Amino acid sequence: MMRAWESRPDCSVVDEPFYACYLKETGADHPMREQILASQSTSREAVAKRLSAAAMTDLQYEKHMTHHMPRGIDLAWTRNIKHVFLIRSPERVIASYREKMPSVSPDDIGIIRQRELFDEITELTGQRPPVVDSADVLANPKAMMREICAALCVEWVDGCMTDWKQGARPSDGVWAAHWYGSVKASSGFSAASVTPAKLSAQDLALAEEMRPHYAAMATCKLPRP
């Protein structure tokens, strides 16, 4: 999704700006921890202030991870921002996380927190944000990206949001070296996988635990009736 928005001539992107804050606050032992802490501010107030400042482009797309946004933080700065929530089946989320990390917990994948944030943003803004399922985007990228633009009242720009040049971007977080192999190799949205994710019994149980939260958000997904 970040590549799709950055391919627009009128849009810049910000990659996980609260990652260093999350690492400092939790002490989480993530790959490239020290490099991430050195690359970003660890002050939530400073990050929010920067994100609230005027952008260099007409549009600014921010990619946030729900586990970077813990319970109790001040979200007032997001009141006038347009939000979109991207959901993915619990099995796919867990399988993707397991490719890079030795263990996984509910807090690691952030599905419960995503549902909480959806409710918090709805209350804060007075509007229910659009929800997008990654499987729907991969099944029909152009149609779904059009839906997202329409929901955000953003003009569709033909020929750029579904295709892009391969390679790294200056906007990529320093953690891209560990996490973004497939992203850097991509030149567009990949085809949706039809092969079920292979999970251990323990991870399957976690997926079932997360399913009600995923299903609740899926009732709000685009395209809306």
Question: Whereabouts are the PLM-identified features?
Answer:
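PAPS-dependent sulfotransferase catalytic domain
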Residues: 62-160, 174-182
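Short, basic, helix/turn surface patches
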Residues: 39-48, 115-118, 183-191
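PAPS-dependent sulfotransferases, especially Golgi type II membrane carbohydrate sulfotransferases
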Residues: 155-225
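Internal hydrophobic scaffold segments of catalytic domains
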Residues: 1-20, 145-165
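Generic structural signal for helix capping and beta-alpha/helix-loop junctions
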Residues: 21-23, 93, 166
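Charge-dense, low-complexity intrinsically disordered segments
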Residues: 34, 104-108, 201
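PAPS-dependent sulfotransferase catalytic core
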Residues: 1-56
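Short, Asp-centered acidic motifs that coordinate Mg2+ and/or phosphate
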Residues: 59
